[in-house]
Amino acid sequence: YLADTAGRCRIVVDDARLALAREPDQAFDLLIIDAFTGDSVPTHLLTREALALYGRKLTAEGILAVHISNRYLDFAPIVAALAAEGGWMALDGADRDVPEDFARLASRWLALTRSLDIAKRIYSTPTSPRWQWQPALPGPTAPVWTDDRTSVTEALFPNPAGVATTP
């Protein structure tokens, strides 16, 4: 699909944070992070320091889109806590048509921006009835991960889909 894009597209194969650090500040309108669906998650992409880097590289109206779909880990409170601490607005978008097949996973994204105008536009953009945006809230105990401290156990769903529990 990249070959068919009308825009200019450059692919960089490297550690995301190291490569992004070499890019000029305020050079991007959109950054997409899509690295959390699997069982091995790069937590260093969801830290205070990482969010500060993304903020420097995005334009004033830029959007950080984070694909957080995961069967066992709920990254929404983690990212929302980072956003709140860093002065970002965060919107949680999810496909409300959850698949019954355990092999499939509903799509869930967080959109972060520092622009109130952009946040309002995302929130009010008509989407399908299956897809809805709502404010992403960190909750009272959501941790702020840093380069020095992360713990995936803080992101565990209380009862992941498809995992048997005993009464």
Per-segment meaning from a language model:
Residues 1-22, 41, 77, 81, ...:
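Soluble small-group transferase modules, centered on the S-adenosyl donor enzyme superfamily
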Residues 37-46:
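Glycine/threonine-rich flexible loop motifs
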Residues 61-68:
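Conserved beta-strand signature within the Rossmann-like core of class I S-adenosyl-L-methionine
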Residues 32-33, 66:
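Redox-cofactor binding/interface segments in oxidoreductases and associated redox assembly factors
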Residues 21-32:
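A short acidic, Gly/Pro-enriched loop at the edge of an enzyme's catalytic core
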Residues 37-38, 69-73:
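Short "lid" loop at the C-terminus of a central beta-strand within the Rossmann-like core
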Residues 46-61:
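A short glycine-rich, Lys/Arg-flanked "PGG" loop and its adjoining helix->strand segment in the class I
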